[in-house]
Amino acid sequence: MFVEFFLDGSAECTAYYYAPSATKISTFPTVWQPASILANDTTAQAKWQSIMGSIPTTILPKGTSTGNFTNVTYSASDPDCWWSYHQCTQPKLSGLSADISSVPEPGTLGFGFDDGPNCSHNAFYDYLTSQNQKATMFYIGSNVMDWPLEAQRAVADGHEICVHTWSHRYMTSFSSADAFAELYYSKPILMQAIKLVTGVTPKCWRPPFGDVDDRIRAIANALGLQTIIWKYDSNDWKAGTGNITTETVDANYQALINNMTSGTFSTQGTIMLTHELNNYTMSTAMKWYPQLKAAFQYLVPIAVALNNTQPYVETNYSFPTFDQCESFLCW
């Protein structure tokens, strides 16, 4: 199977035409704009109609899609298990599983990166390949539409792919139908831009900024998506804003390592939020990788840390068990 990658750094972020995605662009929402169910998309409309009865109507949208919650009135009892309010990860609505914010295997880091695929990620992915390191990549649907070949590379390299919504907005701000669209159109674009070559359909997602409540969880659950959060935040995505400096980010990486060496993860592992957002976040990940590798017993994709050997809908693609990784037989 031939998969084309851009190796020339000067060409990596030059827009290109890729027929399988370009010819279907009219069947998706406008890239980087909040998604809604398209008026002519009878398949999406039928899917929404089939699940809307399971979505709570008593949980209302909160704030704006850019994260302004100033005018939100919300009970201190946190009735909706709203992560942005108090980092709740145990749903209060029956029938929903807890968010994944840690992993059961001791001494283990569920290794992953948000906001890809980044058009300039070849050096980063080359580095991961050189270390025989796989990770979980949380991909934005609009990015996949913009950079389909880069998305292909992740699957070809053996990384796990999860959904990170269509437009990367605060999910609890949307109506239920629009929140459905943010996830629904992300799953198909991952299929259509990647499945043509690799045939994978994700079964996991991460809400941008962690913004999720039981209404959004119910929508994700109805689409077969498991919610993955994190326990530690590198704040690499905030570097250079407010009081967050590159020194802050380095200190956050070091704190994670210190917690590992002090025994914090002796009974269960953890997940740290890091990003494929830009050259800084990827370079920082490479800078700290040797120290993470030395400190943690295992750095593995989140699916492997959860012993999930079938990370996709398709059953012809499988991951190793954690025990296989423990025996250095991962890949």
Please name every model-derived segment.
Residues M1-G110, Q131, A135, T267-W331:
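Terminal accessory/targeting
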Residues K47, M52-S173, D178, E182-K203, ...:
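Active-site beta->alpha N-cap acidic-glycine motif
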Residues G116-S120, Y139-P148, R169-A177, W205-D214, ...:
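Acidic-and-aromatic substrate-binding clefts and catalytic sites of carbohydrate-active enzymes
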Residues A123-D126, Y232-D233, M286:
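Short coil/turn segments at secondary-structure boundaries
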Residues L128-S130, Q152-A156, I219-G224, Y289-A294:
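Short, surface-exposed basic-aromatic patches at helix termini and helix-loop junctions that form
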Residues T165, K231-D233, A303-A305:
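Residues at the C-termini of beta-strands that transition into short coil/loop
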